[in-house]
C-alpha cells in the first residue's frame, strides 16, 4: 500500500490541494478475515466495538463466498471500518483442508488475549501473524479457487486498503473522474473491473481503486513469488437530496450518502486480482 498511498498523498500535498497530509480525510479502512472458529468478523469486530464503533449494514457476496459489515465511528473525524469474511465452509473440501492446516493453530479467540484499551497491544496484534507462513503450493492451490483465500492465508489480517475521501478535497479534485485523471498521471494503475468508477444504484456513492501493488513474497522453504499486496481506494459520497440546498460551508458527513454498496464493493475486491 505504501507506494500508491504515500505517493498519491504526497502529490496531493505538493499540488497545493491541502496544506499537509493530515488534512486528507480517510473515508474508511478495510480488513479481510477468515470465517473459521476463533477468527472472522465475530472476533475482529471486538476491537472496534470496544472503541465505540457501531455495527451497521450486512453485505453478502455470493460468487466470492463473502460476508461483510461496515461499522460507523463514534465521531465524524474517524474513518468507517469495513470488515469482510470468507465463508470457508462454502469452499471445496480441498481448500478447506488447506486453510484449516494453518488456522487450526489458533486455539482460542486471539482478541480476547489483548487489552483493547492498550493501543500498543492492538497495533501489535494487527501486525502479528496469526498462523505460520504458507507454502507456495498451498497459496497457489487456494488461488485457483479463491483469490481472497490466497490473499488472507499469506497477508493474514494486514490492512487491505485505505480510502481517500475525494469529496473532501478542494476545488476540481473533489470530482472522482478528475481525481482519477490525476492519479493516473502519477503512474498509478486503476482497477477497471466494473469500470474505473463504480456507481451505486442510487448514484450517490462513487468509488475507484488502484490495482494492488505486487510484492515479492517469501514462502516456506525460501520460495518466492510476486503476489498482490494492499491498495488505495478513492470514494466520492454525494450530498443527500434532502440537503442539496445547504450552503457548502454547512455540509457535514451526516449530510452525505452513508454506508456501502454490494455491487461496488464486489468490484473493489478485485483490486487484488493482479
Regions found by a protein language model. Give the residues of each.
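Terminal, regulation- and interaction-focused segments at domain boundaries
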Residues: 18-41, 156-177
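Long, compositionally biased intrinsically disordered terminal regions
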Residues: 207-274
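An acidic- and aromatic-residue-enriched active-site/binding cleft used to recognize and process polar
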Residues: 34-36, 58-63, 86-88, 169, ...
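Amphipathic alpha-helical segments
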Residues: 38-57, 171-186
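Internal, hydrophobic cores of structured domains that mediate oligomerization or house catalytic pockets
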Residues: 45, 50-160
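A contiguous, surface-oriented mixed alpha/beta subdomain in the mid-to-C-terminal portion of proteins
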Residues: 112-231
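Active-site loops and adjacent core secondary-structure elements that bind or stabilize anionic groups
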Residues: 10-11
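Single conserved hydrophobic/aromatic residue that forms the stacking wall/gate
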Residues: 1-7
Amino acid at each position: 500500500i505504501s507506494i500508491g498511498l504515500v505517493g498519491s498523498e504526497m502529490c496531493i500535498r505538493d499540488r497545493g490541494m491541502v496544506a499537509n497530509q493530515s488534512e486528507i480525510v480517510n473515508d474508511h479502512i478495510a480488513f479481510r478475515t477468515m470465517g473459521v472458529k476463533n477468527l472472522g468478523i465475530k472476533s475482529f469486530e471486538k476491537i472496534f466495538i470496544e472503541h465505540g464503533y457501531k455495527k451497521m449494514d450486512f453485505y453478502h457476496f455470493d460468487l466470492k463466498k463473502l460476508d461483510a459489515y461496515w461499522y460507523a465511528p463514534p465521531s465524524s473525524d474517524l474513518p468507517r471500518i469495513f470488515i469482510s469474511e470468507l465463508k470457508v465452509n462454502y469452499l471445496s473440501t480441498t481448500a478447506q483442508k488447506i486453510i484449516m492446516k494453518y488456522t487450526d493453530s489458533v486455539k482460542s479467540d486471539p482478541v480476547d488475549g489483548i487489552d483493547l484499551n492498550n493501543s500498543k497491544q492492538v497495533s501489535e496484534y494487527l501486525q502479528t501473524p496469526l498462523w505460520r507462513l504458507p507454502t507456495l503450493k498451498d497459496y497457489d492451490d487456494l488461488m485457483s479457487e479463491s483469490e481472497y483465500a490466497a490473499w488472507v492465508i499469506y497477508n493474514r489480517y494486514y490492512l487491505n486498503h485505505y480510502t481517500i475521501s475525494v469529496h473532501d478535497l478542494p476545488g476540481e479534485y473533489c470530482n472522482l473522474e478528475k481525481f482519477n485523471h490525476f492519479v493516473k498521471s502519477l503512474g498509478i494503475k486503476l482497477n477497471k473491473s466494473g469500470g474505473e468508477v463504480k456507481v451505486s444504484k442510487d448514484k450517490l456513492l462513487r468509488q475507484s481503486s488502484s490495482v494492488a501493488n505486487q510484492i515479492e513474497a517469501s514462502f516456506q522453504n525460501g520460495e518466492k513469488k510476486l503476489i498482490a499486496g494492499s491498495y488505495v481506494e478513492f470514494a466520492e459520497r454525494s450530498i443527500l437530496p434532502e440537503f442539496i440546498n445547504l450552503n457548502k460551508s454547512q455540509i457535514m458527513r451526516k449530510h452525505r450518502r452513508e454506508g456501502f454498496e454490494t455491487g461496488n464493493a464486489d468490484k473493489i475486491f478485485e483490486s487484488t486480482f493482479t
